[in-house]
Amino acid sequence: MKLAITFWGTQKYIEFLPEWYERLEKYFVPNVEKQYFVFTDGDLEGSPDNITKMEIPHYGFPTTYHKTFEEMLKLQDKVSDFDWLVTVDADLYVQQNVEYGEFFDESKKYFGVQHPCQYLDFPPHNEYPGSFDVNPASNA
């Protein structure tokens, strides 16, 4: 079993990487091989061997979100031998053990999770339209 995990952190968001990495190594599907693909404009000198830097510019908000899948296509050849590709937000820290069967479902090719800010009704998620697209002309 091998997991490819992406981290997105340009400018100050790269500061989340050390604790993010430590917690994923410790708590997220322990004892499973993980390779981290870090999309950043920052310096990763001295990083562990299981971190691969994916150089990107700081696009700024909201362009960063719009460029995510375009940038992820650069991983296609690098992750073809992995069992799963997972993206974990830079500011989302794993708090306790997450076992394989609790997170992955072999019967499904794709999956998504609800961001904690939505689940906890943090602004703007607690008011219409929240974070969901409500534009009737949208194909999202």
Regions picked out by a protein language model, each given a short descriptive name:
Residues 1-64, 77-81:
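N-terminal anchoring/stem segment of glycosyltransferases
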Residues 22, 53, 69-70, 104, ...:
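General N-terminal targeting signals
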Residues 51-57, 121-135:
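Cell wall/extracellular polymer interaction/catalysis modules
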Residues 63-73:
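Glycine-rich, basic loop-to-helix element that forms the pyrophosphate-binding segment
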Residues 71-121:
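GT-A fold catalytic core of metal-dependent nucleotide-sugar glycosyltransferases
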Residues 136-140:
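Catalytic core and acceptor-binding pocket of nucleotide-sugar-dependent glycosyltransferases
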